[in-house]
């Protein structure tokens, strides 16, 4: 097929991030300069974000058989770029204290965000697999970036081995789907399923294996075992990327797959996904109750959040509202996670060994960093789904979608899970206002709010509050992303 100027405009975010990768590589080869490479990375990601406006002007189109650029792709590309931008911003002060090579960090984040953009635009199982690998491979290096720390290296090895196993399940599942349907395009799969092929054992086995592979990447129960250890072992800025960009991109492509190929029409698939969602919500919240490490706590909480999102995915066939619910929920989850992990990154910067991730490190934070404590409180309330925060709007949407689709047992799980979650989120929030320990541990810099990372954290908190009270701009944006399907 012929690539026209319109196609190139539609691919602008992908091309800009790809070009930034090349520029940063050449810059590292020419001269190692931490500030220069960080600046180039941030400029590239910002340029890719701005280019989305031009992509919108070009309209929806199939660029290649592998990729479709439309409003849906633009929304998820934007969320991935925001998460990547925040990761680079949080990483800069952290890397200032890091004595080994600093510049490769940005290179790995850029390559991973390239994978995220590919996933957001994927319209074919081959693009889905390439995107997942492109986002996973740089994460092996990023998780083990503080390789002199035993925990970081252990987390990287654990993630690498389990990720390879999950990828093999995913690939074998795709092979079975191809053997039965003869096509890997989402639209062609939809036609095959529409022809009554959905109940073929080979096709169901293929989708079952794909659910195993994707369940690992999204850290859903029972494929979640890596999550708390990897979140704890990875440097704080990397945990930010893991919790946001990789989850959002992969969930976005799963949404598109389910939209084109109505796999959820199969009762067997719906029951399996329902059990996974139920187990993820309950188990994730119960395990977070006893955590004293804030990164492990956020790791378990991310399992439950993906469980909530799965409820909206199961309800996808019952109306467009579930697409809206996922868009709003993911935006709320993104800003809340960026704020929470941003505070951990600020407290852990510059690099001085293990991160400040013990709950004890945050005890009495209000008495010497009141604004930072207030930001962390807002993020905890949003993740808990308290009214007047963006997290509440997302959770309300998920409940509404569950009720609309008559998924009563999953609605009950969401309510019970939210009640359990309230306890451990408030436990973190309350500890910020207790008496500070006699010997204070790690602390954020006194001028943290003037740093780039501090500004990102403050903007996240502001968005969580403003969009929690007045969500209409976000809802309108998400609705704009839907008709172009």
Curated annotation (Swiss-Prot):
Q: Which Pfam families match?
A: Proton_antipo_M
Q: What is its EC number?
A: 7.1.1.-
Q: What class of enzyme is it?
A: translocase
Reaction catalysis annotation = a quinone + NADH + 5 H(+)(in) = a quinol + NAD(+) + 4 H(+)(out)
**Main location group:** membrane
Q: Which GO terms describe its cellular component?
A: plasma membrane
The places in or outside the cell where this protein is found are: Cell inner membrane
The portions of this protein that span the membrane are 8-28, 35-55, 71-91, 105-125, 127-147, 159-179, 203-223, 235-255, 271-291, 297-317, 326-346, 373-393, 408-430, 455-475
Ordered alphabetically, the record's keywords are:
Cell inner membrane, Cell membrane, Membrane, NAD, Quinone, Translocase, Transmembrane, Transmembrane helix, Transport, Ubiquinone
User: GO molecular function, one example?
Assistant: quinone binding
GO terms, biological process: ATP synthesis coupled electron transport
Bilayer topology reads: Multi-pass membrane protein
How would you summarize the oligomeric state and partners of this protein?
NDH-1 is composed of 13 different subunits. Subunits NuoA, H, J, K, L, M, N constitute the membrane sector of the complex.
Family statement? Belongs to the complex I subunit 2 family.
| Functional summary from the UniProt entry | NDH-1 shuttles electrons from NADH, via FMN and iron-sulfur (Fe-S) centers, to quinones in the respiratory chain. The immediate electron acceptor for the enzyme in this species is believed to be ubiquinone. Couples the redox reaction to proton translocation (for every two electrons transferred, four hydrogen ions are translocated across the cytoplasmic membrane), and thus conserves the redox energy in a proton gradient.
Q: Kindly give the NCBIfam families that the UniProt entry links to this protein.
A: NDH_I_N (TIGR01770), PRK05777.1-1 (NF004439)
Name of the protein in question: NADH-quinone oxidoreductase subunit N
Q: Which organism is it from?
A: Salmonella typhimurium (strain LT2 / SGSC1412 / ATCC 700720)
Organism taxonomic ancestry: Bacteria, Pseudomonadati, Pseudomonadota, Gammaproteobacteria, Enterobacterales
